[in-house]
Amino acid sequence: MVVRGDRGRAVARAQGGLEWTDLLPALDPVNFPMLWALSPYGDAVFNERQVPLLLEELDRLPEAYGGAWVDQARDLCQVVQSGTHRYLWFVGD
């Protein structure tokens, strides 16, 4: 996970990453559309208007899906919200 500015320069990075499990694709796309969009094979990018929705989903995420990545994602969401033209990237392989 990384926050990038509009020119692609990294502003902040997570210490770790999201460990992909079979649980993530099982999320209900109606209740978790932001998290459901994540893929281990491609990038997912969230802008400043999508980040509040992502934060709401992280708050509702069942405990089985948790881990250090959730706190790191929250921290990076705050970085996006604290500036302009910032984007949170979940980088796939």
Q: Can you annotate each of these PLM segments?
A:
Residues M1-D93:
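Acidic (Asp/Glu-rich) sequence patches and key acidic residues
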